Amino acid sequence: MIKLIQISNINKSFNKRCVLKNISFDIEQGKCIALIGKNGAGKSTLIDILIGNVNANSGEIFDKDKLLQSENRSIMFQKTMFPDQLKVIEIINLYQSFYENPLPLEEIIELTKFDSSQLNQFVNKLSGGQQRLLDFVLSLIGQPQLILLDEPTSTMDIEIREYFWSIIENLKEDNRTILYTSHYIEEVERMSDKIILIENGEIILNDSTSHIRTNQQSQITLSD
């Protein structure tokens, strides 16, 4: 198993409030890793540290192949924000222009499952779930090897969510590496290869999904 990225003893505080404490784990090639925990557990802060938006107070990130650099990874943030004045197809074309070797337009449209009417309407006319799906597909346009997703299925209905996970399955078969945050236990148990549970800024569980399924002592529960 190839370790692409090693996170070692990451600590972060805001205004003397500890948000992350001694966070350590590995990101392995071709694996789908779930960071789970209640709102405020520190998941999004950790993603921000990984992509360089926030500096850790201490700790190290070993990324020898520079996969965390913007040209080698993609990021889907927790909140989708599109400019209201652009149509769906215009946003797709804009994102294609960012990359030397983007996904072909036909493949992008196939991934969105949008018809001609949806492609030519203003993006704010899409449902919340459709906007999340579009945001996800946009994160794939540059054909990244590392995909970071922060609460990707929020606002998706059951149908869109099922379709989203079918795309994740295809990405896993293509040996893409995925790190995502979630608080949907049923999703992470179904799709992830490894689950990392963060509680009050600390990792309290870091184990393979298969072992968690079969080990009663590792059963996961989240409460608000």
Model-derived features with residue positions:
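The feature captures the beta-strand-to-loop junction immediately N-terminal to the Walker
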Residues: I36-K38
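Conserved ABC transporter NBD signature motif
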Residues: S58-E71
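ABC-family P-loop ATPase nucleotide-binding domains
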Residues: T80-L134
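Catalytic Walker B motif of ABC-type/P-loop ATPase nucleotide-binding domains
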Residues: I147-E151
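A short, surface-exposed alpha-helical micro-motif characterized by mixed small hydrophobic
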Residues: V188-R190
